[in-house]
């Protein structure tokens, strides 16, 4: 993220009021934490200083580096990590975390309430009482008091349990961004300090893996290299952070993600409709997006494809009401045609999910197919609210859907 974007974020975050809640947050949640005004008196904290940021990053990265280099053997020997990222500060995560701390409630908000556009968001909380003393070094207890409960066999497939949930988020290899907030307040006559840290991408994904076992830095993601400061961690080369490796062309008849690596065939996929897409940026690349009104539509024409094992035209996207809680009134219809064949109508996706997911269907047909997908909003007679439609990857995969 460049300096200009940081300035924009800072301006928005400092001046927001509920009625001016950012459009993205209104889309992601009916009650986004960032847009929820504080109803308590903040006696201390209220922001994280530059010195505090360094303490937070050093604390996290030192602990991650300890595990990644195979030096965590206090209770049981934990294997070294091949792909553990060095954490960086994120202003947007911090702004949402500060808004959470300002609620003066020692309880997690929900995933949608702390959601941001770039990635899923995890969260760790700590509350201290007695005096208004802010010490970010204390958050190391998320690691030190729970590491003894995390056994090597819990790593893959990852098994979640509350006894080590803070620890597993701290050491989750693919998490590379952190942002925190802090607030001191009085509750029932007792002085308390609430520390909130939000993480992206979120960890604690059941069935996944906390980290890849192997020699330190032996499996660093694209656009990262072994850190000079923390030799067990993979450090981002550019502000965009770790990048996803493009899938093998052996598995895909066509794969496009709006990057410079897209093959020329991606330009043969046409996108026409009521209004053109606009292009937006994520850490991991670009995506196209648009808000459509009643009766409007967008057609993605993939063209003709053939595969002996069947094929799946797909979008990695999301759609639904532009304001969370309003009526879902849109769908993606799947259209297929081939000479002398009639395919059933009514094949469609109607789930209004705010997370990125595969939109598509596998067709068990080994002859050439003409494929198009149509996003559409219900007609004006139904009085639907505006609906958004966006996707970051598209293509055709042989034999299965991504």
Swiss-Prot record:
Keywords: Disulfide bond, Secreted, Signal. It is found in: Secreted. Expressed by the venom gland. Residues 57-199 form the SCP domain. GO terms for cellular component: extracellular region. Residues 1-13 form the signal peptide. The keyword Signal applies. Contains 7 disulfide bonds. Gene3D superfamilies: CAP (3.40.33.10). Belongs to the CRISP family. It comes from Tityus serrulatus (Brazilian scorpion). It comes from the Eukaryota. This is Cysteine-rich venom protein.
């Amino acid at each position: 993220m460049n300096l200009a974007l940081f300035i924009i974020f800072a301006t928005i975050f400092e001046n927001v009021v509920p009625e001016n809640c950012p459009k993205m947050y209104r889309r992601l949640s009916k009650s986004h934490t960032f847009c929820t005004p504080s109803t308590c008196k903040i006696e201390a904290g209220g922001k994280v200083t530059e010195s505090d940021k360094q303490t937070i990053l050093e604390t996290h990265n030192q602990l991650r580096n300890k595990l990644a280099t195979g030096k965590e053997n206090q209770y049981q020997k934990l294997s070294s990590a091949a792909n553990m990222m060095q954490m960086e500060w994120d202003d947007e995560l911090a702004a949402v975390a500060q808004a959470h701390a300002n609620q003066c409630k020692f309880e997690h908000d929900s995933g949608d309430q702390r959601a941001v556009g770039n990635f899923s968001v995890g969260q760790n909380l700590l509350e201290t009482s007695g005096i208004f003393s802010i010490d970010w070094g204390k958050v190391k207890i998320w690691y030190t008091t729970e590491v003894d409960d995390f056994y090597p066999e819990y790593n893959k497939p990852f098994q979640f349990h509350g006894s080590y949930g803070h620890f597993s988020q701290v050491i989750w290899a693919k998490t590379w961004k952190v942002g925190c907030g802090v607030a001191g307040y009085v509750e029932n006559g007792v002085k308390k300090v609430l520390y909130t840290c939000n993480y992206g991408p979120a960890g604690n994904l059941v069935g996944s893996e906390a980290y890849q076992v192997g020699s330190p830095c032996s499996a660093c993601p694209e656009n990262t290299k072994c850190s000079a400061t923390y030799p067990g961690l993979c450090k981002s080369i550019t502000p965009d952070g770790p990048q996803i490796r493009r899938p093998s062309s052996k598995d895909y008849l066509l794969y496009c993600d709006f990057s410079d690596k897209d093959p020329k065939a991606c330009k043969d996929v046409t996108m026409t409709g009521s209004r053109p897409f606009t292009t937006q940026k994520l850490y991991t690349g670009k995506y196209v997006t648009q808000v459509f009104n009643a009766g409007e539509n967008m057609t993605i024409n993939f063209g003709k494809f053939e595969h002996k094992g069947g094929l799946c035209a797909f979008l990695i996207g999301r759609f639904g009401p532009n304001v969370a809680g309003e009526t879902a009134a849109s769908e993606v219809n799947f259209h297929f045609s081939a000479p002398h064949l009639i395919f059933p109508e009514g094949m469609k996706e109607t789930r209004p999910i705010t997370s990125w997911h595969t939109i598509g269907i596998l067709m068990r047909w080994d002859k050439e197919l003409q494929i198009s997908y149509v996003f559409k909003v219900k007609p004006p007679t139904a009085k639907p609210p505006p609906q958004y439609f966006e996707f970051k990857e598209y293509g055709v995969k042989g034999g299965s859907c991504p």
